Amino acid sequence: MIDTSVIIKALFSPSHRRAGTTYSRELKTHESCVALLAILDDRGIEVLIPRCGIIEIAAVSTRLTNSSISEEICNEVETSFTIVPEERLIAQAKKIALSEGCPGFDTYFLAISEQNLIPLFTDDLGMHRICERRTIHSWILRDIDLKSVIPDLK
């Protein structure tokens, strides 16, 4: 399970202007996101994304590029990953929202991980902390050592 932050950070290199003093950390995170997606693809590991993740990717990628490229990105995500409809997640996502008060889109990613007992890769520290509270196995990409995680990926 990957959060949209992983997809976006894999696709777009950090900008010196936007990243400022955190540029080196953001560049390392970008490289980790690219490497993670390559590993998942090379190993044929199914990656689940809630349908609403497509909307989040569309919004963020349009801000970073343009709507035409953003649409291409969304189409590629829809063909590369398994899209999970909200109907399969709504009850669990609602429980998570009621207990955690987290952003709405996040609840769908958390629901997939929790329902399917699969780990979540994210670069969203808030989502990672919710995972810790809920005992969802997760990794924060800015701190990850992929070599130590690779044996866990099945």
How would you describe each model-predicted region?
Residues 9, 59, 128-129:
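Alpha-helical elements of the RecA-like P-loop NTPase motor core of helicases
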Residues 82-126:
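Active-site neighborhoods of divalent-metal-dependent phosphate/nucleic-acid chemistry enzymes
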